[in-house]
Design a protein with these regions (language model features):
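Bacterial N-terminal signal peptides that target proteins for export
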Residues: 1-8
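Hydrophobic helical h-region of N-terminal Sec-dependent signal peptides
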Residues: 9-17
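Solvent-exposed, well-ordered loop and adjacent helix/strand elements within mature globular domains
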Residues: 22-130
Length: 130
């Protein structure tokens, strides 16, 4: 009986891990500009280079804290699918949002960016490292 419980526990954990890794999540998307108020530093300690953000070299996002519970960690690459071509593609999770936010993503954008001005919904997928 003990062996059965151990096997069952392992199977359940494997299913949970597999779900969180291969899952897709639909999130409310907004944009943010990390100006002087934050000191140009993200929550994971990365320094924001405004020129690289403007040129599209640094595609960074902030996720709501509840996404960490689903297996997303700083440095993870995520793939975005949306109706907005400027948002589609791969982004790196570098920053976190307020603890009040749930099922949300913030895209780091250059100042006065007009890629999207109204909140929208996007689907995210975690990209597994090779």
């Amino acid at each position: 009986m003990k062996k059965f419980k151990k096997v069952l526990t392992i199977l359940v954990l494997a299913l949970i891990i597999n779900y969180s890794v291969n899952a897709q999540h639909v999130l409310r998307a907004t944009k943010y500009y990390a100006g002087h108020n934050c000191g140009w530093i993200t929550a994971d300690g990365s320094r924001i280079n405004e020129t690289r953000v403007k040129n599209g070299q640094d595609r960074w996002v902030a996720l709501s804290p509840d996404m960490k519970k689903l297996g997303y960690n700083f440095g993870d690459t995520i793939r975005i699918e949306s109706d907005n071509p400027h948002l589609n593609g791969q982004w790196i999770f570098k920053d976190s949002m307020s603890s009040k936010k749930k099922k949300s993503i913030d895209f780091l954008m250059p100042r006065k960016s007009d890629y999207f001005n109204n909140p929208c919904y996007v689907t995210i997928y975690k990209v597994e490292k090779a």
